[in-house]
């Protein structure tokens, strides 16, 4: 506490402390109403000249009031809140130096009698305080409760040691003990044991807290009130203590909102903290404009799913109303984009409130809409307009953007959505706009492309080994054998027609030709030449014809990747892409890989006299 030897102050810090003393001297001679008017004027200036803060408040208003707010109605709420908040903040400085007479004129206590009874006779009251109104009042009203043995509050020490000493003395002058979180919790727990009142600002974001809903959206919440309550061993009471503005220079200090903890919740930190959040939310809803919404209460941090245990997940499932919204802008090549599936499944599994919003080329959209881990899928054609449509807007603000695509135009549109955290690869041409840059894994031998995306996920969450293959999604009764002679990668990956004829003859009947509808004309012609049925499918319907009991003989491309997705066994010829990097994921596949010195070439058409796979025989494939 202040009794400790403070670090030596710098010249700048000393100057700041002198300026603060002068400021307080001026405040002493001003009436609280004058300070409030001055605060409102400053509030209008803050609103007018700080667009960044306006955006933060607008985001928070959509969370605490209505996620569908937009336009003039949202702007009006933002203005009112910024003006009110600045007024309240200005008045907190005056509150610390007000006389008892001035305080009595400005503050009305609600529930003070029951509050004092609870805090007397060895009982402990933990006052859970939101950042709302003029919360400095709660430190000043200590003399009004003579029966309370000890009266204290948690606070964050200032970096300026001179200013810290001044503020500390002003806060303790009237008998309120101040406990710094930097000094540990020993004195706090001693107060809890001896009895009294302890105030804790309970609505601050903390990465080390429990991740549970507040106003229906998950955020890191301090479990300190719950910890202190449990330490009281039955002699503790939790209340939501808040202040709200009722007029120019006037506030109510509400001390009557007791938080009842059920027997089923008493042993769970997450459950007790959830009850605290619910009570604070109810208290703040009585005057939502008084809330301090000019900071990011619902932050998106690099690690957004750390140590979320089953108790927290239970509270999330029970109380979450607004999801944690992740935008994933996938690669434009379908064959590459589909390899992000394990990455997506990892993200979706890390927290119950995760919502994945996929931004993709139009030809991919229908496929992503069929995936149960995907919330919404929009196209790269005006994605901002789609993501802000009424259907998607109602789920609240976006939190995080994984920019995997290298489409700069799309990236600029997505930045306009103001995601709080943007992440991607360090070798992306868009890396200047990416906050968290992941280095692709580099080993002694080439690694599968899936591992790149899992490495990106591991930068933010703990991986749980989510698979690429989900055989339950395929056609369980299908036992067909298919050939897939057309590659979505281009003619460089095609195999000679004579060899397909030989393969069909050696498979001895029951073989069908499988192709994407984009290759309909070529597929029907070749199927007629081979004398076998032709089955056409789309990426989004491939699971209807393929299943874990099917076998596919194919050239590299999208179809073998779709087949592997549902557990179909694949025999694949690869030439323009490295097999170690792009082979169909899963077990039981056979890959035959050939390349000449000029390859892998990644060309749509081969410019060589003889393609790489020309020497692959039917025996090799079988």
Regions found by a protein language model. Give the residues of each.
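Short amphipathic
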Residues: 107-112, 252-260, 440-441
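Residue-level signal for inorganic ion chemistry
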Residues: 61, 229, 288, 347, ...
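Membrane-anchoring hydrophobic helices of lipid-metabolizing enzymes
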Residues: 2-129, 169, 306-318
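Catalytic core of membrane glycerolipid acyltransferases/transacylases, capturing the structured
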Residues: 121-182, 207-210
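Catalytic machinery of carbohydrate-active enzymes
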Residues: 53, 70-72, 82, 120-121, ...
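A conditional alpha-helix N-cap/helix-loop micro-motif detector
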Residues: 105-109, 160, 178-182, 218-219, ...
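Non-catalytic C-terminal accessory region of glycerolipid acyltransferases
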Residues: 2-3, 11, 49, 79, ...
């Amino acid at each position: 506490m202040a009794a400790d030897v403070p670090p030596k102050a710098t010249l700048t810090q000393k100057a700041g402390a002198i300026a603060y003393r002068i400021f307080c001297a001026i405040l002493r001679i001003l009436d609280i109403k004058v300070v409030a008017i001055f605060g409102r004027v400053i509030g209008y200036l803050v609103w007018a000249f700080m667009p960044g803060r306006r955006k933060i408040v607008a985001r928070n208003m959509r969370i605490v009031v209505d996620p569908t707010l937009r336009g003039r109605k949202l702007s009006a709420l933002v203005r009112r809140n910024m003006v009110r908040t600045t007024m309240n903040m200005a008045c907190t400085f005056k509150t610390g130096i007000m006389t008892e007479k001035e305080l009595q004129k400005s503050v009305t206590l609600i529930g003070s009698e029951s509050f004092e009874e609870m805090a007397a006779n060895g009982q402990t009251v933990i006052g859970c305080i939101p950042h709302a109104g003029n919360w400095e009042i709660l430190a000043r009203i200590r003399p009004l409760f003579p029966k309370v043995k000890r009266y204290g509050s948690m606070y964050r020490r200032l970096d300026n040691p001179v200013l810290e000493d001044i503020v500390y003395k002003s806060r303790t002058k009237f008998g309120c003990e101040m406990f710094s979180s930097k000094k540990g919790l020993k004195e706090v727990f001693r107060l809890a044991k001896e009895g009294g009142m302890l105030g804790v600002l309970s609505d601050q974001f903390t990465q080390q807290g429990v991740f549970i809903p507040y106003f229906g959206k998950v955020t890191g919440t301090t479990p300190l009130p719950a910890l202190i309550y449990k330490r009281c061993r039955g002699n503790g009471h939790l209340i939501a203590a808040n202040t709200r503005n009722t007029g120019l220079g006037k506030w109510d200090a509400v001390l009557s909102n007791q938080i009842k903890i059920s027997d089923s919740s008493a042993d769970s930190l997450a459950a007790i903290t959830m009850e605290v959040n619910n009570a604070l939310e109810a208290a703040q809803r009585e005057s939502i404009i008084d809330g301090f919404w000019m900071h990011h209460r619902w932050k998106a941090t690099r690690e957004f799913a750390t140590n979320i245990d089953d108790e927290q997940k239970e509270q999330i499932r029970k109380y979450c109303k607004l999801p944690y919204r992740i935008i994933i802008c996938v690669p434009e090549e379908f064959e590459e984009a589909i390899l992000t599936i394990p990455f997506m499944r990892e993200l979706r599994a890390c927290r119950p409130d995760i919502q994945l919003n996929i931004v993709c080329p139009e030809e991919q959209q229908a496929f992503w809409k069929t995936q149960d881990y995907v919330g919404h899928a929009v196209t790269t054609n005006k994605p901002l307009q789609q993501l802000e449509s009424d259907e998607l807007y109602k789920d609240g603000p976006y939190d995080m953007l994984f920019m995997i695509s290298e489409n700069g135009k799309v990236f600029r549109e997505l930045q306009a959505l103001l995601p709080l955290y943007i992440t991607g690869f360090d070798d992306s041409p868009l890396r200047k706009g990416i906050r968290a840059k992941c280095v692709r894994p580099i080993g002694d031998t080439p690694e599968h492309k899936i591992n790149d995306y899992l490495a990106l996920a591991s930068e933010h969450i703990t991986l749980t080994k989510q698979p690429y293959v989900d055989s339950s999604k395929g056609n369980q009764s299908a036992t067909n054998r298919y050939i897939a002679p057309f590659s979505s990668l281009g003619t460089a990956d095609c195999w000679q027609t004579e060899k397909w004829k030989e393969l069909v003859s050696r498979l001895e009947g029951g073989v069908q030709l499988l192709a994407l509808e984009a290759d309909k004309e070529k597929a029907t012609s070749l199927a007629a030449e081979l004398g076998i049925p032709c089955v056409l499918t789309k990426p989004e319907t491939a699971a209807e014809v393929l299943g874990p009991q099917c076998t596919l003989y194919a050239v590299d491309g999208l179809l073998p990747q779709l087949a592997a997705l549902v557990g179909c066994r694949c025999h694949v010829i690869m030439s323009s892409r490295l097999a170690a990097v792009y082979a169909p994921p899963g077990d039981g596949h056979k890959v035959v890989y050939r390349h000449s010195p000029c390859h892998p070439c990644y060309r749509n058409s081969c410019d060589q006299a003889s393609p790489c796979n020309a020497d692959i025989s039917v025996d090799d494939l079988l």
